[in-house]
Amino acid sequence: MKRALFALPLLAAWFLAACSDDRALNDVIPVADPLREPARAAPFEYGRPGWIGTDPARAAGSAGEIEAFADAAENDPLWTHPRNPVLLPQLQIARREFREALGVSPRVPSAVAARAFAGAAAALRQNNEPAAVAALAPVGGAATFARLSTLPRLPRVEEAAQAVANEVNGRGRNR
C-alpha cells in the first residue's frame, strides 16, 4: 500500500511533464470525437466575411469538414441525437450549397467526398496541384479544382458551422 501511495506523485509528475512539452494536449490524451475540435473552431473559420477568399486549400478543407459533419449527423451515434432538432437539416442544406458551388453531384457519398476534399486540401497545403486534382477525381477532378478558388459567399454553410459549434459547446454537452 505504501508503495502505491509513493508511486502516485511520481505518476502525476510524469503526466504533468508529458503535458508540458510543446505538443498539444490532444497528442497526449486523444479526443473521443474527431469532429469536436473542428466543430469548436467552425465559427472562427466560417464566420468571417471572405473566410475562404481565393484560398483553394481552405475551401477544400472546409468542404471536407461540412461533408464530415453532415455524414456524422446522419450516421454517427455521437451526433445523431442533437439538442438542436434542426441541426441535421441545416447540415444537409449546407452540404448541398457547397456541392452546388463546386459542381459536385448529390449522388456522391459523403464519406467519398470528405476523403476527396481532405486529400485535396492536404495536397494544396504542400503546393501539389496535380495531386489535388487527382484527389478530387471522385467529385469532379479538374472542374471542381477550378471552382475552389472562385467560391461565392455560402451563407447556409456559415449558419450550419455556427449551429455545429453551438451543439458542441452547449451546456451539458461534453463530447
Report the location of each language-model feature:
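Bacterial Sec signal peptide processing site at the extreme N-terminus
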Residues: 13-36
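Residue-level signal for the start and early helices of compact helical domains
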Residues: 7-10, 37, 89, 139
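Long, hydrophobic N-terminal alpha-helical segment
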Residues: 28, 32-58
